[in-house]
Regions:
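Charge-rich, low-complexity N-terminal segments
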Residues: 5-105
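A hydrophobic, small-residue-rich beta->alpha segment in the mid-to-C-terminal subdomain
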Residues: 151-186
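Phosphate/ribose-recognition catalytic cores of enzymes acting on nucleotide-derived substrates
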Residues: 98-143, 148, 154-155
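Mixed-charge, low-complexity intrinsically disordered regions
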Residues: 1-2
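Short acidic-glycine loop/turn motifs at beta-strand connectors
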Residues: 79-81, 125-128, 159-164
Length: 186
């Protein structure tokens, strides 16, 4: 049995960048001291650069039963080795959880961090006044060349401008545990 060192996100890269993965891990085998720099370089080349080139971000929000929600898409505002921010424009409806009507010209900034257990959505008026924040609690976020993916844990935290944060939908999380969709430990 042979054990070989791997770079971070090995299985993800196997599906999206197998040649780059193979080259990086060959280098790692010869130079284990370069692991951190290899991790950073491959992440930059295979995840962040394609996102920056495209300029668009797609957020895949998967429900615990396996059913994906309609992907949220927006324009990339910024990215760094830890994550990214993208902007969405709204025109109608109500803000999820905040129960506030959407006005024309309102926009949202979504902050995504690789490996984070939450995704932060901040909503603003067209005049840049904060409406509120919506924190989606989820499995650790995985970044891809097109955007991000995570499993929604159904419980969220909302915070209207000037108010304290509030936990919502806790009963959905309890039901998921009771039905065996997610573990009690999770």
């Amino acid at each position: 049995l042979t054990v070989a060192p791997t770079i971070s996100r090995h299985h993800r890269y196997r599906t999206i960048a197998s040649k780059t993965l193979e080259q990086a891990e060959q280098t790692l085998l010869k130079h284990p001291e370069k692991k951190e720099s290899l991790d950073d370089a491959v992440f930059q080349m295979e995840i962040l650069l394609p996102l920056e080139k495209e300029g668009l971000v797609r957020l895949e929000h998967i429900r615990p039963a396996g059913k994906p929600m309609r992907p949220r898409e927006g324009v990339l505002v910024s990215s760094d080795p830890h994550g990214l921010v993208f902007r969405r424009i709204f025109s109608q409806g109500r803000y999820d959880g905040l129960n506030v009507p959407i006005q024309e010209g309102d926009y949202g900034l979504t902050e995504i961090q690789e490996g984070a257990w939450s995704v932060k959505h901040s909503y603003f008026t067209r005049n840049h006044q904060l409406i509120g924040h919506y924190y989606n609690i989820n499995s650790p976020v995985e970044l891809y060349p097109y955007g991000a993916r995570y499993l929604d844990l159904e419980v969220d935290i909302i915070q209207r401008a000037g108010e304290k944060p509030t936990l919502i939908d806790r009963e959905k999380l309890v039901l998921l545990c009771r039905n065996g969709c997610i573990s009690q430990e999770l």
